[in-house]
């Protein structure tokens, strides 16, 4: 007999070899029908596999968080079967579940077309309706390689050849079709349901290597219910309308081009937005006791070798060969991918005492990372970016209070910027790590206490911390429900040791400071791209690149319009005067497309009376105000949440 511990703590005994599916049915017939898979001691397994030893067991159903990954994994297999049924000779490679769906890479001489996707999707529905069971088989390694080569599936043969010799080779069948797969799978194709859709075809190199063959990747999405699918498709449609690249052009904020791949050309209006955000963060940091620094871009490789980045992060760095010695030894420089080693260099200048701690060092640091060209995306994923980076050097006893204060600062910033749905995750010690268990216990508990002190609910992620310390991640939900990982706080016990940072403690001896890596926005470029999509370009007045446009109805009001614009400018507002000889409806339409929050419409009457007609973006009504009243109201509305002293950059 085996003892099964259930999620509620109850213990049941079953004959050794009882399957997960049989256990589910024994608990309740309805559970047996709803079961999709099981988790045994935290690992997912097929329902049909026997349970051979005592364990903790959880029955996974369609409502389980893990269900979507299982559904999407099976949908990828069903799509591959459909493709090979419709287009014989197509070779299959890999097909995983991903964040919102699945994909499968195919080797085929003819390109897939939109019409092909319609046919493949229809065939997938047929396969689901057939409700063929998924069955698991274990094959001998050599037999599997020989078999796949014999049927022309060279990619599958390569995958098996590259697996460790100890790896069990498993094949899953669904009807007459089969594929190499570790599993687990649902009981049958019918359990996938019909809430799926094929989305697009893209190119992909075999194993992600540009030196290999180009394959065709078909992307799909799959969900538990038709409603979830419809909601997701609506979100995609809404995201296309909000695409920061499209709005960036319409609002004249920035552009990117091939001659500077992965870098942003900020236009005057976009740079005004950038500087407004930067100045806001700077004001918040000043109030929180940070000192701002500026560090170089280019360093001798010795610094990055000492910090560990040359070995651990070297492939993502831009390197410059500076010289070659007579013996052939090459000397390299590295463009910094992050700011932390440089901040340690500043900390090391001069003797530091425990009285100097905590030291909060901030920088709007310009960094470069050698991202693959295929991964670049507008300003959301670039090679050259600026981080609102800071490092807090403190004692171990100060970690909890510093984390608490940082979380409060971070949450305040997100609220000011319009984000109130925040998921917090605490990544805990990995198996391979530096430091003692006692140090990790203290660090992890300090972060827990700090999170609770800010009334933050958080999810713990065992094993997902960095090898040098635990990490807190902040995930923001935007206006259409997408999640973005932004801020982080990471404890680092390693870098101060590697780069020989120390302070004199109360005992007169040298000690290593704890280093807290933290960023609120992360990359400013990425955060601005995210905000453009979150607000659909309709920024609150204080952030808007152009806050006010003064538009004339008749040419007789041109001089007055310029006077109004100058008055607003002196009040600190970002303003344009539109005195073109065009109809007012055209001006309204164009400035609405540019997402200008406020238009002040002036004609002969307004010029004579010293008034303006205030028109809000998206509104149909106008409010006539005296110029002085309008300026006072708009100045107050445009006040930065960081305080009245924040400068409003002109463009």
Curated annotation (Swiss-Prot):
Annotated keywords: Aminoacyl-tRNA synthetase, ATP-binding, Cytoplasm, Ligase, Metal-binding, Nucleotide-binding, Protein biosynthesis, RNA-binding, tRNA-binding, Zinc
Annotated catalysed reactions: tRNA(Thr) + L-threonine + ATP = L-threonyl-tRNA(Thr) + AMP + diphosphate + H(+)
Keyword Amino-acid biosynthesis among UniProt keywords: no
Annotated GO MF terms: ATP binding; metal ion binding; threonine-tRNA ligase activity; tRNA binding
Catalytic activity, EC: 6.1.1.3
Residue numbers binding Zn(2+): 340, 391, 517
PROSITE patterns, per database record: AA_TRNA_LIGASE_II (PS50862), TGS (PS51880)
Highest taxon listed in the record's lineage: Bacteria
The keyword Transport is annotated on this UniProt entry: no
InterPro entries in the cross-refs: aa-tRNA-synt_IIb, aa-tRNA-synth_II, aa-tRNA-synth_II/BPL/LPL, Anticodon-bd, Anticodon-bd_dom_sf, Beta-grasp_dom_sf, TGS, TGS-like
Places the protein is found: Cytoplasm
GO terms of biological process kind: threonyl-tRNA aminoacylation
Pfam family, one: HGTP_anticodon
Gene3D superfamilies to which the protein is assigned, alphabetical: 3.10.20.30, 3.30.54.20, Anticodon-binding domain, Bira Bifunctional Protein, Domain 2, Threonyl-trna Synthetase, Chain A, domain 2
UniProt region (Catalytic), positions on chain: 243-540
A cellular component term, taken from the record's GO annotations: cytoplasm
TGS domain span: 1-61
Cofactor note: Binds 1 zinc ion per subunit.
Cofactor requirements of the protein: Zn(2+)
Subunit structure: Homodimer.
Family: Belongs to the class-II aminoacyl-tRNA synthetase family.
The protein's role, per its UniProt record: Catalyzes the attachment of threonine to tRNA(Thr) in a two-step reaction: L-threonine is first activated by ATP to form Thr-AMP and then transferred to the acceptor end of tRNA(Thr). Also edits incorrectly charged L-seryl-tRNA(Thr).
Identification of the protein by name: Threonine--tRNA ligase
Annotated gene: thrS
